[in-house]
C-alpha cells in the first residue's frame, strides 16, 4: 500500500493518474476509485490527465461498482431485491405483525416515512459491518425489542422468499474470503482518490484486498505542516490528516508527501493564511491587490438578484472567450435555488447541467396512480376524481365532456362513492343535460366501481384485476397519444416512467407472490414505489455550466467558480441525525461491537468535515472565485457565513462587494436579459446620474432591441394609463335592442350601470354568470324568508300571529324547493335554523300592523304597453321589477311599499343623486301603475325592513326595558316617507327628518329618478361602456365595485383618473355641515340644477 498527500493547490488527480499509468505499465489492471458523488466528474478529469488520452486498463468507478464487476456473473441464490422491493417486503412484514407485538412503533408501522427509516437503517447496518443481532446492545429495552423483532422478521421473510438484498461489496468480500477471486486479484491494483474517510464496509474491503496482495494507492490533500502537527484539533486539514494517520497506523505505511514545482498562486497564499489562523501559528505570507482580485465576496438582496448577477458575469466571460464548461456554479441550498435557477439561466440563455436526480412525481402516470390511491382511501372526493380525469390517461372523454362533467360535479357538490353511483337528478332551471351527464358518469364510474369491488386477494389475482382496469381505462392508448408531437427527449422520459411503473408491479408480484393483499395496500405500495423513482440525469452537451451543491466540490474543479447562497444557516451545513438510532445509540453500538464495525456519528464529524469542505471551496477555482451571500433566502432573513466574514479580516482584508442594479453595459447578457434589464430599470429609480456615454449606450441598446423584437414579430405588452373600450357596432345594437321593442331596465340594472358601466356590459349585455351551485346562498336565503312572510300575511285565519308564523315556517321548510337545499347537510340545516330565528324576530314587526293592511305581496310592475319613459328619439323605456309588499293605511287609503333586506340598508340622497340608490324612488313611481292606486289618496312612503335577529350588548343597557328597546331598533321600517302621512305611522317607522318629503319634494325626486333612467338608457343604446368604477374618497376603489379586474385590467395606482368621482355637496356654501331638512333641501336643489343643465 502507498499513501500519498500533497498541497491543496497541486492536482492530486494528476499525481494519482501518474501512479495509475505506472501500475498499468507494470501489467496491472487498475480501478481508479472515487466517491459516489464525484465518480462521473472524476472520469473526465482522469481522461484529461492521461498521457495517452485513453486506457483500457484503467477503470474509473466507485467501490460498489467495482465489486459488481467481480460478482456480475455470479449465480445468485436468491432473487435480487432493490430498494422498492425491499420497502414492499418490510411493509408486508410489518402488516403481518400484530399491533401488540410492537410496543413503540405499533401505531406508525404502516407509515411510509417509518418504512423508509427502517430501510435506511437496514442499509446503514450493512455498510457499518454490523448484524441485526448487534441491536441487542441498545439501551432502551422497548425500542431494542421492537427493532430486533422487525429485522428478525424481515430476515426471515428474505430467507423464506429466497430474496437477496445484500450489497455488492459484501458479496465481493465473501468471494475474496473464499479465495474465488485470487487469480483475478493477482493483477489488480487500486488507486483511491477524493476520500477523507471510509465506511466500515469500504474499510473492510480495502483490508481484505491488501491482505491478498493487491497494490493500493490512496491519495488526499494535506499540508506538511498539518501532517506533522502534534495537535490537530481545529486544523483545516484535520479530516484528511486523521484519515492518513489511521491508514498509516493500520497498515504500517509511512505517507509520502508529493511536492510540486509550480509557483504558489493567490489561492495557495490565502489557504496558508487561513491554516495559520486555525492552528494558531504565525504567518509571514502576505497578499497583493492582484491576489485579492481573484477572490470576490458579493452581498446581494435576495437569491433572484444573486442569480442574475451570476448570469450576467457568466455571459460576460463567455463574450471574452471562456467556455461554459470552464465555469462551475455551487449552490448553498439546491432546493431553494432550483426553480429560479432555471428561470434566470433560460432568460440569459445559459446552458447548464444540475447533477441531481429529478423525481417522476409530476408525470401524468404517477398522478394517475396517486389519484386512484386517494379515491380509494378517501371514498371518491371530488378533487381526486377530477385529478384522475385531468391526467388525460383515464377513459376517452373529450375536453368539452370533461368541462361539462366538472361543472356539474361542482354545481351539485357531488362527493363520495354513493352519490357518484346514482343517476344525477339535481338541476337548476334545466341548465344541465342530465341524460348526457349520466352517460358520462357511467363511462367514468363503471371501470372504477368494478376495480374497487376487489377484496383482499392474492397478488397475482389483484394484478390481473388491475390489468383489466387499465385496459378498460385505455391507459396504454392514452399514453401513446401523449407521446404524439413530443421531442425525442420527452419521449425517452415517458419511456422511463413506463419502465419504472412496470418494475414496481414486477417487484410487487415478486415480493407478495401468493400472499393476500388489500386493494388499499396495493395502491399505496405502487404509489410509494413510483414516488421513489427518478429520471436519469445526463447532460445534453459537454459545453455546459455544471451546477452542484457546494459540499460536493473538490479542489481545482474549474477555472471559474461561483458559490452562492453561502449564508450562516447554509454554510457550513450541520448534518442532523434523523434516523431511528440517536447519536447516543450509535456510540453505544460502536463501543460494544467489533473494531471493524462502525456506525457513522454525524455530529462528531461535523466540525472537521465542514472545515475541510470550506478549504476545498476556497480552492475550487484555478483562476477566479466568487463567494456570494444574499440577505434574504425564500423571503427569510439570513446573515453572511462566518467563513466569508473571516476572509474580510486582516491580513486577508478582502472587501465585500455590495451588488446593486446599475445601468451598465456589463450587465447585458442576452436579448432576453436586455429586455428584462430595461423593464426593471424603467420601473425602479437609478441611484446615480448617468454619464453622457451611458445615456447614449442605453439609447442605442433600446433601438437595437426594438429592431430585434420587430424582426422576430414580438410586441411588448404594456400597461396603459388609459383603459379604452370598443363601441358596439350598429348591427350588434340592433340585435341586442331592436328598434321596435322598448329598452328594458330595472332598479338593479340602473345601479350597476352607474356603479361601473363596463360591469353592466359584462352582466347585462354579455350576461356573464357566477358559477352555479346547489348550496343555499344569499339569494336563496332571501327567497326562503320572503316565502314565510308571504304565507303569514296571506293567512286570513283567526289564529294568533305566532301560530300563523310557526305554521308558515313549517310549510315553507317542507316545500320541495327548500327541503332539498336545506336538508342536505348539517351545515345547511344550521343555516335554516338561523333563518327561522330571523323570521321569528322579524315577525314581531309584522305582528303589530297598527293601522296598516297588506294588499299585495311579490307584486310585479312594468310592461311594454305602459313605458316608464320615452326618449327624445321616441324610443320607449320600460322599468320592471317586483315589490315585496304593498301596504295601505286604513285611515287615509294611501299606499306604501316595503322591501325586505337582509342587511342594514338606508336611503342616501348622495348615493341616489349619483345613481346608486334608486330602488325606493322606482317603487314609488311603480305604485302609480297599480289598480289600487288612487291619485287623490297618494302614497305614504317606500321603505326597507331589515330581516335580522338583533343582538344587544347588555353592557350597553341599564335595564331590561332598555334591552328590549335596543333590540327593536334594527326592526324598524326605514326609508322615504311623505310628511303629511307620518302622523298615521306608529313607532315601528323611523321618522328621520332628512327623509320626510313634501308632495313637491316627492315629485322632484321621481322626476330626477326618471332623469337617471333616461341618462342610463341613452348611454346603453349608444353602445359605449367605459371602464369607470366609482370611487367614494378619490383615493381607492372598493372591492365590491371593481370585481372584474382580471377582465378590465384596472389598477388603482394607474387608472384612478378614469374612476367616476361621486358628486358631493359644495361645503363652501354652508356654514356648517347640513343635517335634517337642510340636507334634504340641499340635495333636492342640486337635483333641480342637474336636470336644468
From Swiss-Prot:
Its EC number is 3.1.-.-. GO terms for molecular function: 5'-3' exonuclease activity; ATP binding; double-stranded DNA binding; helicase activity; hydrolase activity, acting on acid anhydrides. One of its GO terms (biological process) is double-strand break repair via homologous recombination. Its cofactor is Mg(2+). The keyword Phosphoprotein does not apply. It is an enzyme of class 3 (hydrolase). It holds the Pfam family ADDB_N. Disulfide bonds: none annotated. InterPro entries: ADDB_N (IPR049035), DNA_helicase_suRexB (IPR014141), P-loop_NTPase (IPR027417), PDDEXK_AddAB-type (IPR038726), Restrct_endonuc-II-like (IPR011335). Keywords: ATP-binding, DNA damage, DNA repair, DNA-binding, Exonuclease, Helicase, Hydrolase, Nuclease, Nucleotide-binding. Despite having helicase-like domains, this subunit does not have helicase activity. HAMAP family: AddB_type2. Heterodimer of AddA and RexB. Belongs to the helicase family. AddB/RexB type 2 subfamily. The heterodimer acts as both an ATP-dependent DNA helicase and an ATP-dependent, dual-direction single-stranded exonuclease. Recognizes the chi site generating a DNA molecule suitable for the initiation of homologous recombination. This subunit has 5' -> 3' nuclease activity but not helicase activity. This is ATP-dependent helicase/deoxyribonuclease subunit B.
Amino acid at each position: 500500500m502507498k499513501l500519498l498527500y500533497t498541497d491543496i493547490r497541486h492536482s492530486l488527480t494528476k499525481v494519482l493518474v501518474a501512479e495509475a499509468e505506472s501500475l498499468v505499465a507494470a501489467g496491472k489492471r487498475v480501478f481508479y476509485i472515487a466517491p459516489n458523488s464525484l465518480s462521473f466528474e472524476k472520469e473526465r478529469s482522469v481522461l484529461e490527465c492521461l498521457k495517452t488520452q485513453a486506457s483500457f486498463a484503467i477503470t474509473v468507478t466507485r467501490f460498489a461498482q467495482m465489486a459488481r464487476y467481480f460478482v456480475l456473473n455470479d449465480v445468485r441464490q436468491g432473487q435480487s431485491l432493490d430498494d422498492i422491493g425491499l420497502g414492499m417486503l418490510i411493509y408486508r412484514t410489518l402488516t403481518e405483525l400484530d399491533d401488540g407485538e410492537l410496543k413503540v412503533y405499533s401505531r406508525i408501522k404502516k407509515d411510509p416515512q417509518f418504512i423508509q427509516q427502517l430501510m435506511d437503517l437496514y442499509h446503514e447496518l450493512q455498510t457499518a459491518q454490523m448484524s441485526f443481532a448487534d441491536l441487542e446492545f441498545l439501551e432502551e429495552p422497548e425500542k431494542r425489542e421492537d427493532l430486533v423483532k422487525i429485522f428478525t422478521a424481515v430476515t426471515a421473510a428474505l430467507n423464506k422468499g429466497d430474496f437477496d438484498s445484500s450489497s455488492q461489496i459484501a458479496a465481493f468480500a465473501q468471494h475474496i474470503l473464499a479465495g474465488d477471486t485470487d487469480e483475478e486479484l493477482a493483477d489488480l491494483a487500486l488507486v483511491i482518490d477524493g476520500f477523507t474517510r471510509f465506511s466500515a464496509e469500504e474499510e473492510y474491503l480495502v483490508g481484505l484486498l491488501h491482505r491478498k496482495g493487491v497494490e493500493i494507492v490512496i491519495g488526499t490533500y494535506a499540508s506538511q505542516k498539518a501532517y506533522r502537527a502534534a495537535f490537530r484539533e481545529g486544523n483545516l486539514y484535520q479530516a484528511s490528516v486523521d484519515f492518513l494517520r489511521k491508514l498509516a497506523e493500520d497498515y504500517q505505511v509511512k505517507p509520502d508527501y508529493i511536492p510540486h514545482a509550480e509557483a504558489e498562486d493567490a489561492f495557495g497564499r490565502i489557504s496558508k493564511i487561513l491554516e495559520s489562523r486555525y492552528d494558531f501559528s504565525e504567518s509571514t505570507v502576505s497578499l497583493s491587490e492582484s491576489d485579492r482580485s481573484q477572490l470576490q465576496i458579493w452581498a446581494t438582496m435576495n437569491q433572484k438578484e444573486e442569480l442574475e448577477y451570476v448570469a450576467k458575469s457568466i455571459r460576460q466571460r463567455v463574450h471574452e472567450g471562456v467556455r461554459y464548461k470552464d465555469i462551475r456554479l455551487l449552490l448553498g441550498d439546491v432546493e431553494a435555488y432550483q426553480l429560479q435557477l432555471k428561470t434566470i439561466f433560460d432568460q440569459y440563455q445559459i446552458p447548464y447541467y444540475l447533477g441531481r436526480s429529478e423525481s417522476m412525481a409530476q408525470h401524468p402516470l404517477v398522478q394517475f396512480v396517486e389519484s386512484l390511491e386517494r379515491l380509494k382511501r378517501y371514498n371518491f372526493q371530488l378533487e381526486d376524481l377530477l385529478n384522475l380525469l385531468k391526467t388525460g390517461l383515464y377513459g376517452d372523454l373529450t375536453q368539452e365532456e370533461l368541462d361539462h362533467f366538472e361543472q356539474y360535479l361542482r354545481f351539485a357538490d357531488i362527493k363520495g362513492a354513493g352519490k357518484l353511483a346514482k343517476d344525477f337528478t339535481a338541476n337548476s332551471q334545466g341548465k344541465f343535460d342530465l341524460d348526457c351527464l349520466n352517460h358520462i358518469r357511467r363511462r367514468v364510474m363503471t371501470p372504477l366501481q368494478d376495480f374497487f369491488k376487489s377484496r383482499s386477494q392474492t397478488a397475482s389475482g389483484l394484478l390481473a384485476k388491475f390489468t383489466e382496469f387499465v385496459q378498460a381505462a385505455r391507459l396504454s392508448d392514452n399514453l401513446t397519444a401523449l407521446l404524439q408531437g413530443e421531442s425525442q427527449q420527452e419521449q425517452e422520459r415517458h419511456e422511463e416512467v413506463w419502465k419504472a411503473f412496470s418494475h414496481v408491479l414486477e417487484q410487487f408480484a415478486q415480493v407478495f407472490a401468493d400472499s393476500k393483499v388489500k386493494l388499499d395496500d396495493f395502491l399505496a405500495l405502487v404509489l410509494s414505489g413510483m414516488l421513489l423513482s427518478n429520471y436519469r440525469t445526463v447532460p445534453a452537451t459537454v459545453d455546459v455550466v455544471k451546477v452542484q451543491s457546494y459540499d460536493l466540490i473538490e479542489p481545482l474543479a474549474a477555472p471559474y467558480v461561483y458559490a452562492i447562497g453561502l449564508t450562516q444557516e447554509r454554510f457550513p451545513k450541520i448534518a442532523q441525525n434523523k434516523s431511528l438510532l440517536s447519536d447516543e445509540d450509535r456510540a453505544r453500538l460502536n463501543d460494544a461491537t467489533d473494531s471493524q464495525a462502525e456506525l457513522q456519528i454525524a455530529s462528531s464529524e461535523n466540525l472537521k468535515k465542514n472545515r475541510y469542505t470550506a478549504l476545498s471551496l476556497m480552492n475550487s477555482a484555478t483562476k477566479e472565485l466568487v463567494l456570494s451571500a444574499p440577505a434574504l433566502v425564500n423571503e427569510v432573513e439570513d446573515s453572511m457565513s462566518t467563513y466569508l466574514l473571516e476572509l474580510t479580516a486582516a491580513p486577508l482584508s478582502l472587501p465585500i462587494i455590495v451588488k446593486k442594479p446599475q445601468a451598465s453595459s456589463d450587465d447585458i447578457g442576452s436579448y432576453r436579459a436586455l429586455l428584462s434589464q430595461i423593464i426593471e430599470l424603467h420601473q425602479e429609480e437609478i441611484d446615480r446620474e448617468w454619464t453622457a456615454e451611458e445615456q447614449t449606450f442605453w439609447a442605442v441598446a433600446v433601438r437595437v432591441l426594438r429592431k430585434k423584437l420587430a424582426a422576430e414579430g414580438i410586441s411588448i405588452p404594456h400597461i396603459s394609463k388609459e383603459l379604452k373600450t370598443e363601441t358596439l357596432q350598429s348591427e350588434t345594437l340592433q340585435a341586442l335592442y331592436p328598434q321596435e321593442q322598448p329598452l328594458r331596465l330595472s332598479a338593479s340594472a340602473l345601479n350597476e350601470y352607474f356603479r361601473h358601466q363596463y360591469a353592466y356590459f359584462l352582466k347585462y349585455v354579455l350576461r356573464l354568470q357566477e358559477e352555479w351551485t346547489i348550496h343555499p346562498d344569499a339569494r336563496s336565503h332571501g327567497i326562503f324568508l320572503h316565502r314565510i312572510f308571504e304565507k303569514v300575511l296571506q293567512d286570513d285565519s283567526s289564529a294568533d300571529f305566532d301560530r300563523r308564523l310557526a305554521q308558515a315556517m313549517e310549510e315553507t321548510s317542507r316545500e320541495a324547493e327548500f327541503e332539498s337545499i336545506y336538508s342536505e347537510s348539517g351545515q345547511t340545516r344550521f343555516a335554516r335554523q338561523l333563518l327561522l330565528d330571523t323570521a321569528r324576530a322579524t315577525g314581531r314587526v309584522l305582528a303589530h300592523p297598527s293601522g296598516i293592511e297588506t294588499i299585495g305581496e311579490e307584486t310585479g310592475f312594468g310592461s311594454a304597453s305602459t313605458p316608464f319613459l320615452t326618449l327624445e328619439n321616441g324610443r320607449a323605456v320600460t322599468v320592471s321589477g317586483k315589490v315585496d309588499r304593498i301596504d295601505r293605511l286604513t285611515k287615509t287609503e294611501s299606499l306604501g311599499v316595503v322591501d325586505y333586506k337582509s342587511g342594514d340598508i338606508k336611503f342616501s340622497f348622495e348615493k341616489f343623486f349619483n345613481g346608486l340608490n334608486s330602488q325606493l324612488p322606482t317603487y314609488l313611481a311603480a305604485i302609480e301603475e297599480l289598480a289600487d292606486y288612487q291619485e287623490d289618496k297618494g302614497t305614504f312612503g317606500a321603505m326597507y325592513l331589515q330581516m335580522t335577529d338583533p343582538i344587544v350588548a347588555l353592557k350597553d343597557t341599564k335595564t331590561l326595558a332598555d334591552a328590549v328597546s335596543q333590540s327593536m331598533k334594527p326592526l324598524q321600517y326605514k326609508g322615504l316617507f311623505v310628511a303629511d302621512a307620518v302622523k298615521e305611522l306608529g313607532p315601528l317607522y323611523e321618522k328621520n327628518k332628512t327623509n320626510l318629503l313634501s308632495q313637491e319634494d316627492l315629485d322632484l325626486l321621481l322626476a330626477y329618478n326618471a332623469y337617471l333612467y333616461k341618462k342610463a338608457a341613452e348611454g346603453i343604446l349608444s353602445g359605449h361602456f367605459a371602464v369607470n368604477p366609482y370611487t367614494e374618497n378619490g383615493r381607492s376603489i372598493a372591492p365590491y365595485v371593481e370585481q372584474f379586474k382580471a377582465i378590465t385590467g384596472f389598477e388603482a395606482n394607474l387608472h384612478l383618473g378614469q374612476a367616476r368621482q361621486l358628486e358631493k355637496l359644495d361645503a363652501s356654501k354652508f356654514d356648517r355641515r347640513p343635517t335634517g331638512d337642510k340636507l334634504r333641501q340641499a340635495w333636492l336643489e342640486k337635483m333641480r340644477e342637474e336636470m336644468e343643465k
